[in-house]
Each structure stands twice: as C-alpha cells, then as structure tokens.
C-alpha cells in the first residue's frame, strides 16, 4: 500500500435520543468511548471515534440525540448535533426499528433535506427486536418526505449484525486522503473527558427522574502514584441539595456503588489499577448558566 491509496473521511451519526448511536460507535471502535444508558440525551458532546485499518481511516462524530431543548444545555446539545452535518463527508441517520417514525425523526429529516452534496445513509437499528416480515414496512415508512438515501442498512449495534458490511460500504465510498490520527488512537477527546463520561454513565444507570439530567462530572486530579496505581479525584455536580442526597445515598451506599462500577470501567480503559475518589457538589441551575456550562466543558466555540 502507498500513501496515495489511503482513504479517509468524517462521518456524522445523528438521530433521536436512545436509537443506539453511541452503542454503534462503541461497536465500531471496539472500546467504550461514548457512554450508554436507557436515559434520553445521554450524549452531550460530539464524540469523535476513530476507526483505522491498513488502508483507511474513518472519523465518526456521534452527536447528542436531537430533542426539544428545555434549557441552555439542551440548546447547546441540539446545536452541537446539527453543526456536525456541515463537517461530514457522509451522514448516518439512525432510527429505531422497534419504534414508529415520529415527530423527532421528521424534525431531523427536514434538516437533512437541507444538506447538499453529502451522501446520507438510513440505518435501521435494533432489527434484532423486529420480526423479519416487518422490516420492509419500516424501511417504507422512511421513504416519503425524506432525502434520497445513499444506502439503507438494517443493523443491530448491540449484536453487531451487518455492522462489518456497513463499514466496508462507507470505506468504499471515501475519497483518498490523509491519516488524521495515529492507528491506535480511538478518540480525539482527552483522557479526562472519557473518564468523566464513564462516571456520569454510572449515575445515569443508577438514578431516576430528574437526577440523571442534572448531573455533570469534573475530573479534578489524575496522578500516577507509582507504576501500578492511578489516583483520580472527581466531582459530581448537581443542581439541588436533594439531588446530592440521592447520589450519596443512605450511609453513602449510592456513591460507593457509582464509584465501584466506574472504577472497573476506568481500569479497563487505562490498563492500570485505579484509586477513585468522588465528591458531590451543588451548582444551582448550572444547566441554564452559560458561564457554568463553559466551566463544565460545554463550550459552544468547540462545536
């Protein structure tokens, strides 16, 4: 292989909340870089996952699920999602095969129809939950009042069904280009960001109601104490004292469970033993305060 035959490009992944975008990205790169949860709006930043082979590199942008904004953070998330469309060489629009086409899908489709000269793929995800005879009806429901799809792929991000074929297809359509990142690099986000997201994932998995959406995580310190252990200090940010009490739990049981689960994932990520300390802090209405959003890493100029 010569450098002139190397292919590369950027692919934006967009869709409603909870259709499996982050699961698909993690399936492709083979590591957990985007957090997953049954809560809507899990992804808040555009996560760039990097897939590299001997002759190609695809940089994937996993956008926040598009929803009606309820606060400044929500507005940031939606703007972040649509800005990715203008950066991409191709777009993957992911829908949930187990759910009927809805207003959220139509809202995204309207924006996709404004995109010119960029191939748009329709990915029908979660086909493992669908009766085989129903697949054609699902595909047909996305043919009217929609862009002309470059390709339609039924997939299961969870099981991996048809994902290798999808990757082969997108690589075949890329133009020749440079290798933007080292072959062993899986994301362009710094280590602190990914660690913080792994902690936030555990909060999302273990709490309910308004608590998951009110949480941010700040990594205060990462220090290697010796050759075998990494010391991490993290602050879990909430908006109200009642939320702080929920996350701490009775006699500290909840915060201990969050820390234990997060530590295991962080150790797998870093390949070393981790000593994780977590604190819970109250920042009133941080989701509606632009300065607080910037401090916590949601910076519009980055997107």
Swiss-Prot record:
**Keywords, in A-Z order:** Cell membrane, Cytoplasm, GTP-binding, Membrane, Nucleotide-binding, Ribosome biogenesis, RNA-binding, rRNA-binding
Gene (UniProt):
era
Please list where the region (G3) is annotated.
Answer: 62-65
Q: Name one GO cellular component term.
A: plasma membrane
From the UniProt record, give one GO term of the biological process aspect: ribosomal small subunit assembly
Q: Recall the GO molecular function terms of this protein's record.
A: GTP binding; GTPase activity; ribosomal small subunit binding; small ribosomal subunit rRNA binding
Regarding protein family, the annotation reads: Belongs to the TRAFAC class TrmE-Era-EngA-EngB-Septin-like GTPase superfamily. Era GTPase family.
Question: What binding partners and quaternary form does the record give?
Answer: Monomer.
Annotated segments matching region G5:
155-157
Organism, as annotated:
Leuconostoc mesenteroides subsp. mesenteroides (strain ATCC 8293 / DSM 20343 / BCRC 11652 / CCM 1803 / JCM 6124 / NCDO 523 / NBRC 100496 / NCIMB 8023 / NCTC 12954 / NRRL B-1118 / 37Y)
Question: Where are the residues of the annotated region G1?
Answer: 15-22
Q: Which domain of life is it from?
A: Bacteria
Q: Where is the signal peptide?
A: none
Q: Does the keyword Cell membrane apply?
A: yes
Era-type G domain location is 7-176
Q: Please report the stretch or stretches of sequence annotated as the KH type-2 domain.
A: 207-284
The UniProt record gives the binding positions of GTP as 15-22, 62-66, 125-128
How does the protein associate with the membrane?
A: Peripheral membrane protein
Q: Which InterPro entries match?
A: G_ERA_dom, GTP-bd, GTPase_Era-like, KH_dom-like_a/b, KH_dom_type_2, KH_sf_prok-type, P-loop_NTPase, Small_GTP-bd
What does it do?
An essential GTPase that binds both GDP and GTP, with rapid nucleotide exchange. Plays a role in 16S rRNA processing and 30S ribosomal subunit biogenesis and possibly also in cell cycle regulation and energy metabolism.
Q: Which CDD domains match?
A: Era (cd04163), KH-II_Era (cd22534)
Q: What is its main location?
A: cytoplasm
- Asked if the keyword RNA-binding belongs to this entry, the reply reads yes
Q: What is this protein called?
A: GTPase Era
Q: Where in the cell is it found?
A: Cytoplasm; Cell membrane
Annotated region (G4) at 125-128
Name the segments for region: G2.
41-45
């Amino acid at each position: 292989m010569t450098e002139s035959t190397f292919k590369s490009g950027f692919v934006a992944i967009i869709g409603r909340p909870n259709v499996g975008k982050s699961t698909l990205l993690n399936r492709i790169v083979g590591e957990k870089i985007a957090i997953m949860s049954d809560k809507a709006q899990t992804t808040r930043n555009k996560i760039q996952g990097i897939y590299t082979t001997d002759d190609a590199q695809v940089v994937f942008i996993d956008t926040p699920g598009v929803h009606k904004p309820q606060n400044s953070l929500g507005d940031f998330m939606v703007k972040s999602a649509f800005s990715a469309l203008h950066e991409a060489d191709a777009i993957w629009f992911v829908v949930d095969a187990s759910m009927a086409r809805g207003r959220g899908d139509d809202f995204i489709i309207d924006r996709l129809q404004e995109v010119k000269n960029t191939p748009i793929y329709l990915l029908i995800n979660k086909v493992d939950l669908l009766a085989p005879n129903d697949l054609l009806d699902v595909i047909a429901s996305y043919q009217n009042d929609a862009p002309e799809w470059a390709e339609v792929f039924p997939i299961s991000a969870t099981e991996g069904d048809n994902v290798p074929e999808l990757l082969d297809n997108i690589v075949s359509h890329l133009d020749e280009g440079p290798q933007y990142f080292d072959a062993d690099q899986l994301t362009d986000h710094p280590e602190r960001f990914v660690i913080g997201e792994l902690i936030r994932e555990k909060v999302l998995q273990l709490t309910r109601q308004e608590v998951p959406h009110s949480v941010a995580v700040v990594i205060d310190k990462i220090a290697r104490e010796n050759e075998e252990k990494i010391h991490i200090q993290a602050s879990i940010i909430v908006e109200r004292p009642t939320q702080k009490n929920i996350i701490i739990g009775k006699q500290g049981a909840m915060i201990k469970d969050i820390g234990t689960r997060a530590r295991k994932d962080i150790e797998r990520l870093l390949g070393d033993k981790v000593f994780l300390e977590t604190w819970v802090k109250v920042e009133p209405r941080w989701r509606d305060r632009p300065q607080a959003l910037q401090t916590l890493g949601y910076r519009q100029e980055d997107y």
